[in-house]
Amino acid sequence: NITLQTAAIDQETHIRTPGFAVTETDSLALIHKINRHTQPGDIIILSGSLPRGASTHFYADIITHCRHKSARVFLDTSGPNMATSVQALPFLIKPNVAEMEALIGHRLTTNKAILNAAQCFIRQGVEVVIVSLGKNGIIAVTQTEALLAYCDKLPSQKLITTVGCGDALVGGLALAYQQNKSFAEALKLGIACATANLFSQEPGMVAPPLVDEIKSTVKLDSLKNL
């Protein structure tokens, strides 16, 4: 994927190519490698669309193998791939509102509706549902918690790009979980990483001092009384 930035007119041009193709042998080799190296408690991130040639159940197969190893899968994909993969019960899913609407089959126009939709997947066995609200933050749901997390004050810098913010969010969450941080601390780090990415020339290359600065401004509002 290529992103061209035209600063003079504040415009981005996105070039998306199909990418490489894989064979069934390639897919099986990757699953075998995951089986061989994955340990209990590990975090595996499955992100983006499937490569050409991969089975529509490829992510679901990986999730199943990881569950057998007591590893945690963070799933960040969309469309039919998300619908198929979520049935294998990853540890965490991160749809945006439109992707959640596609999963549920109807519009979600309020935070309460989004919360109810997220809780459907919690009841099915997904442990964490993170619904991205774009600039308005995220709705984060587990069996015991329901929170709206957002950045209360942006740094006084020029925004560069939104490309990679979702990846930075997932990366921050994964790091926090790997460090056994609390759910609240994981959300704060995830939001801080995603927000810091707005000011980065390279997607995902966030500056730790800026992440720390933003983290102190992240707010968590309970949604339990919605």
Model-flagged regions — what are they?
Residues 6, 17-19, 48, 77-79, ...:
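Short, structured patches in soluble enzyme cores that scaffold and shape functional sites
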Residues 57-145:
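Conserved phosphate/ATP/ADP-binding segment of small-molecule kinases
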Residues 1-41, 212-226:
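Conserved N-terminal subdomain of the carbohydrate kinase-like
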Residues 13-25, 46-53, 69-72, 104-106:
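Flexible, glycine/proline-enriched loop segments at strand-loop-helix junctions
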